C-alpha cells in the first residue's frame, strides 16, 4: 500500500465495502456525537466521512484534531445505514471506520475557516489565499479556469494554429497603458519593459513566414483596478493570422469562443448570430462599446422634439453646436416612484438628475403623458416622442442632453440600471456582438490627437484616409462584447511602413521616434510583410463570466488587491541598498 493513500477522498463507493484502505487529506470538520466521532476528510477530489468510536485505537488522537490538520487514516470501508446516505456526495453511500491515524501536518488556529460559506473581508482572504483556495467555490473556479485553458489550447490546435512563446522581457511601447519597467544591470540607465501584449512579436512571427500563431500569453499593464480587470497582469488567448481580412478573423475565433461557452456555460443559452455593430451606432444606442444586448433597450436621438420647445433647458442647450438630446425608453417604468429611483441613480453618477416622461391612462380612457417635461412640451410633442420610441401606457422615457461625449457613458449605465430594475435582462444567456469601425484617433483633453485603440491597426482607406481629418479615420479594429464585457479585441495590422509612419505622425510621433521605438518591426516590414491580423481574448474575464462571478479576483489563483498589492507575498517591497547599487538606481522621496 502507498505510504499516504490507496484512494482519494472522492473515490470510494459502495463497491469498496469491506476493503482496508488508506486516505490522506485535510480535516474539514469534526463532529462528536456522544462518543462517536464523525470526521469529514477532504482532499482535492472530494470528501469522505471517517468515523471512530471509543473502541478505535485512533479515537484519542482524532478527538484532539484541529480543523485543516493534514492526516493519514487507515481504516475499513463500511456501507452507511440507508437512512444516513448522503446523495450530495459521490462517497455518500460509505464511511470509513478509522483504525489508525497519523498527523502529517498540524494546523494552527485558522484566521479563515475553510468549512462553510461565510464571507470574509477581502484583505483576510488575500493574505491567507492558500486557505481561501481550499474553500469549495474558489477551488472550483480555479479548476474551471484550468479546464477552460486546456479546452482553448486544444481548440486552437484543431483549427490549425501553432503555439509559440514570445519574450517576457522586451522594450517599452505605447499600447494604451503604463508599462512595468525593469532596470538593466548590464546597461545602467536603461530599462526593459514587461510586455503589455505580445503585439509586435506576433506580427513578426507572421513576417517570419509562419501562418497561424497562438499562445496563452501573460500580459502586464500598470492599470487602475476595476472589478473586471486585474491591476497588474492577466492572461489572454493571443492569436495572429497571415493573409486575412477582418471577416476571416471573425470566422476563426467565433467557433472557439462559441464552443467554449457551450461547453462551460452551465446550460445557459449561447447566442450564435453575432451582429456587426459600428462603434458610432453602439455608442448611440447603448452608450457603450461593450453593450449588454440581453437588455432590449435602445436609446434614440429625440432632439427635434425639444428644439424650440417649451422645455427651456433642452431648447437652449440645443442652440449650441454638437449637442443633442437622447431618450432612454423604460417599458414598464411608468411611475413616479420608479422615476425617483432613477433620478437617485443619476445623482449617484454625478448628474443633477434625468428628465422623464411617463405615460398613463387618462380619465377619458386615452393615453396621456405626465411629468414636468410633458407639461412643458405639450401633448403633440409628447405623443410624437411616444410614437418614435414605441412606448405606451405604463411606460416611461428618460432624457439626457449635451455633447454626446459628456453624457454617453452615464446614459449607458442608466440604460443598464433601467434594464436591471425593470427585469428586462435575461440572465440565462450569453449574447455576443462584434463592435467594428472604431475611430483610429481621439482628441485628448489637452487638444492633442492620439490613438484611440491599437496603434498598429490598418486605417480603413489606407494612406489616402490619413490625409484628411484624423478624427474621421476609422481603423480595421474590432472588439467582441458579451453581456456588457469586452472579451476579445483585435485588428487588421498596418504592415506597410509608409502608412505606419503617417499614422504615427498624426499622433505626434516623428519618423525617428517610430524607428527608435519600433525599429525591429519597421525593419521587418521592409523585407516583405504579408497582410495579417488577429485578436486576443481575455481568459480571466471569460472565466469570470462562465463562473458567474462579478469580481475577477474570484477566478485568479493569486490576485493582487485593489491597490495592486500582493498581501500574501508582501509585494511590492522595498529593494535593498545592494540591489539599488547594482542597478545604479536611487529612490527619490515622495513629493
Curated annotation (Swiss-Prot):
GO terms (BP aspect): aspartyl-tRNA aminoacylation
Top-level taxon of the source organism: Bacteria
Pfam families named among the record's database cross-references: GAD (PF02938), tRNA-synt_2 (PF00152), tRNA_anti-codon (PF01336)
UniProt-listed Enzyme Commission number(s): 6.1.1.23
GO molecular function: aspartate-tRNA ligase activity; aspartate-tRNA(Asn) ligase activity; ATP binding; nucleic acid binding
InterPro entries linked to this entry: Aa-tRNA-synt_II, aa-tRNA-synth_II, aa-tRNA-synth_II/BPL/LPL, Asp-tRNA-ligase_1, Asp-tRNA-ligase_1_N, Asp/Asn-tRNA-synth_IIb, AspRS_core, GAD-like_sf
Keywords, sorted A to Z: Aminoacyl-tRNA synthetase, ATP-binding, Cytoplasm, Ligase, Nucleotide-binding, Protein biosynthesis
Major site of localization recorded for this protein: cytoplasm
PROSITE patterns: AA_TRNA_LIGASE_II
Self-association and partners: Homodimer.
Family per similarity comment: Belongs to the class-II aminoacyl-tRNA synthetase family. Type 1 subfamily.
Protein name: Aspartate--tRNA(Asp/Asn) ligase
Native source species: Paracoccus denitrificans (strain Pd 1222)
